[in-house]
Design a protein with these regions (language model features):
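Long, charged low-complexity terminal regions
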Residues: 369-371
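Bacterial Sec-dependent N-terminal signal peptides
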Residues: 1-26, 460
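Short hydrophobic/aromatic-rich beta-strand segments that constitute the beta-sheet cores
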Residues: 60-61, 97, 162, 196, ...
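A short, acidic, flexible beta-alpha connecting loop/helix-capping segment that sits on the rim
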Residues: 423-425, 436-442, 532
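Residue position within the beta-strands of beta-propeller blades
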Residues: 60, 134, 196, 243, ...
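C-terminal outer-membrane/trafficking sorting elements
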Residues: 13, 462-540
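Trp- and S/T/G-rich repeat-edge/linker motifs of beta-rich repeat architectures
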Residues: 25-46, 53, 65-134, 140-184, ...
Length: 540
């Protein structure tokens, strides 16, 4: 049936966008360290470092720093206590060990999904290859050699292949700490690389090789380095690759012989950088609120007096950045934990996590942290607030604090630091998963945790009816969604799930558009065009 949209047709009235809040929200624990999976493999760990959605599964990287299951901290079983990647197949399943990294890999330093689009020669692949990558370093105390290795998951059989990035001499630790990886295409040569920050050794790169079980052929010489402070983030913004090290933000100059320049420096703040804190943390590309280009969001944590200050860097038009103060977490903590004083705040362990709130249509960024506090009578663990806190940033740059699983009790297990967060990958589940801990050099056996916050889809209240200027059909739909309008031309549209994550986007060029939704899991979604929105149902 062909539908014509004319002035005589009554514009579709639908349930739209005056949504106040998701009132039915509940917390539950998804992972508790110290148990076993269905194959009787031990799942312990002191902290969950990353949570990643990959092909409708949820993966968690788990480390054993300061965990007494590890032989370096008093353990006796050499077959447990090393870094793991665990997997959750559905919300009601139990976590499974997916990768055991092996002896001397104390923790996975990074877990990230990357998408390869080109071969080693710069030619486009027939179809992109989406790969889950983990990486870490392993010190050998017999040979005094440190080996940095990446692991790539084979999704066909669930195994992991390895690729060596680099080897070097002692000491280990921050010299080989691989905290981030990023895909980038050199704008001059057209070659695609995966870049890795390898501690003070510098910036390394590799190319896609499907014949390699580890998927990547790494170049064992640093493209740039050594560095005085380990980099904690690497990002693409405004068509260029950037990374942070200490107080400095570097930009790559592309070409056959690439180089790096400093685009911004926080040295004027006068803080001495403690390498453990790192300086610039959580480097994240965001939309520039003052322009049409990209800006950066970051947390400034230079040393033991860090207050968790968040800055935004906006391009200044001359190759550098203007620095804009956004907030100081220590002040927000003092308001949230009444009567307390936060003498030290460390956060942005990975990135500022972005999602779109489907209720307000607002873009939110989450960032976790830990706080050393005094006063107010709040429960503490080795000086740190015992509960897990995270901050939420709205699109106006305003911040608020929330606590994982509600206010923690004096007898509850310590959560301390929220290190990571990700939207649920599971069809029919509207939830955000959170993970973390951070031993802070204290004994921390089986302290790793994952909580999830559920949003009940049927709990959206204050829904009012408005007339929209567009028609969508069919609704419900299983494969394609058609959009028709007389008035909207060359408008951007977005499809958002009920966690606020953008899952499809595109443009209406003219009066009609066809949107492929076949890959979306069955659920309720919101289609947003300009300042209007409409709800639809995706079916099998």
């Amino acid at each position: 049936m062909k539908i014509y949209l004319t002035k005589r047709i009554v514009v579709l009235t639908w349930l739209i966008c005056s949504y106040s809040m998701l009132n039915a929200q509940s917390w539950s624990k998804s992972f508790t360290a110290g148990g076993y999976d269905s194959d009787n493999k031990f799942l312990g760990g002191s902290e969950v470092l990353q949570l990643v959605n990959h092909k409708s599964m949820l993966f968690a990287s788990v480390g054993y720093w300061e965990d007494e299951n590890n032989i370096w901290y008093g353990g006796f079983n050499t077959n447990i206590g090393w870094g793991q990647i665990n997997r959750l197949d559905n919300p009601s399943a139990i976590w499974q060990e997916d990768l055991f990294m092996g002896a001397n890999h104390l923790r996975p330093e990074i877990l990230k999904q990357v998408i390869f689009t080109k071969d080693q020669f710069g030619n486009l692949l027939t179809s992109p290859d989406t790969v889950l990558i983990a990486a870490g370093y392993s010190p050998n105390y017999i040979t005094n050699i440190v080996t940095v290795t990446s692991f790539a998951r084979n999704d066909l059989n669930g195994t992991w292949g390895e690729s060596e990035i680099v080897q070097g001499g002692f000491p280990a630790g921050e010299n080989y700490s691989i905290r981030d990886i990023e895909m980038y295409v050199d704008q001059q040569t057209g070659l695609e690389y995966v870049f890795a920050t390898v501690g003070t050794q510098g910036i390394y790169k590799g190319k896609y090789n499907p014949a390699n079980p580890g998927k990547i052929d790494w170049i064992s010489t640093a493209e740039f380095g050594p560095l005085s402070i380990r980099p904690l983030g690497i990002e693409v913004a405004n068509g260029a690759l950037h990374f942070s090290s200490g107080s400095k933000l570097y930009r790559r100059i592309d070409g056959v012989s690439p180089s790096y320049v400093i685009d911004h420096d926080f040295s004027d703040l006068g803080a001495k950088i403690n390498s453990a804190a790192g300086g610039i943390r959580g480097l994240t590309t965001i939309n520039n609120p003052s322009g049409v280009d990209d800006a950066f969001l970051l947390m400034w944590c230079p040393n033991g007096q860090s207050q968790g200050t968040i800055y935004r860097l906006e391009p200044d038009g001359a190759g550098g950045f203007n620095r804009i103060y956004e907030t100081k977490l220590s002040l927000l903590i003092a308001s949230f934990l009444v009567g307390s004083n936060a003498s030290y705040v460390l956060g942005a362990y990975n990135e500022f996590y972005e999602y779109i709130n489907p209720i307000s249509n607002d873009t939110i960024h989450l960032v976790g942290f830990e706080a050393n506090i005094s006063g107010g009578g709040h429960p503490i663990w080795n000086g740190y607030y015992k509960g897990g806190l995270f901050a939420k940033r709205d699109s106006n740059g305003q911040y608020s604090i929330e606590e994982i699983n509600g206010t923690i009790g004096a007898n509850d297990t310590a959560l301390v630091a929220n290190r990571c967060y990700v939207a649920s990958p599971f069809p029919g589940e509207s939830a955000v998963y959170f993970g973390g801990f951070d031993p802070n050099s204290n004994a921390s056996t089986n302290m790793a945790w994952v909580y999830k916050k559920d949003y009940q889809v049927n709990a959206i209240d204050d829904i009012t009816k408005h007339e929209t200027n567009f028609v969508i059909y069919p609704n419900p739909s299983s494969n394609q969604l058609f959009i028709e309008s007389e008035n909207l031309e060359d408008y951007e549209f977005n499809i958002i799930n009920l966690l606020g994550k953008e899952v499809v986007s595109g443009r209406i060029n003219g009066q009609t558009a066809t949107v492929d939704i076949s890959s979306l899991p069955p659920n309720v979604y919101i289609l947003r065009i300009a300042n209007e929105a409409v709800k639809f149902v995706k079916t099998n």
